[in-house]
Amino acid sequence: MADETRRAAAAELRRVHQGLADDGFALTTEWDLGLPPKCAKNLQGTYFDGGRLRHDDGDMPADRERARDVVLYEWHDGKLALEEYETIAIWDRSDIKGERIHQRVALLQDPQAADLIETFLSLVPEQRRQARGTFGINLFRTHSNVVTKPHHDEEDFIILYVLDREGDGAESYLYKHEEGDAETGEQVLRHQLNPGELMIFEDSRFKHGATPLTPPAGGQAKRDVLVCTVDLPTTYLQRATVS
């Protein structure tokens, strides 16, 4: 990365950190963060079009194809150490009770994906970073409803990175957290993420979701997205103590 590109990316990180501090969310792009050209296209071709996704019975929305990875990270003097975590299991998510284990993709074997994970973890302001934690990466392809309803993921931060979209709709929204239905809170964001665009937000402050996809004339709608979670300690590392 050239010096000028590094400086621009560092300035963009500071802007994202300030947005999170002020508003609880921030929008950015792969270009502003200094990610490699065609990063989204490369990831889509390798994982989404490369036969790495699958549909699991009972998953919602019913037309979703997905894969997942979980990475253990540690910060040391501003540097990250990454390794694959021992499990990708999730429990009691999306109104589905019990344990689920989806298709795993070992992203750290891919240098570009590993660099992307480092960049995503750097989006978290330094004062909010856990010294050691887990990072979930969900690869979702959907054709109709992106999500079933406004919700929390019960994690620390959520990152959305859209790789590709065919058709319209899929407008991401955030409502300020209030007890009861999400619509009773103030909507603070409604934005259609285009390929190469990202959003990060603090999960506890908002209920989030997205509008349904609308197919193009004579075609089929599709959205390929990474939904990443900077996990709370209780998701994995402290799970045994709270079970």
What do the predicted segments below correspond to?
Residues 129-194:
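Catalytic core of non-heme Fe(II) oxygenases with the double-stranded beta-helix
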Residues 17-19, 62-63, 127-129, 149-151, ...:
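A general structural signal for short secondary-structure junctions and capping/turn motifs
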Residues 1-95:
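N-terminal auxiliary "cap/dimerization" subdomain that precedes the catalytic jelly-roll/cupin core
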Residues 4-5, 78-79, 126-146, 191-212:
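Generic detector of solvent-exposed, compositionally biased contiguous segments
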Residues 72-134:
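Signature of the catalytic double-stranded beta-helix
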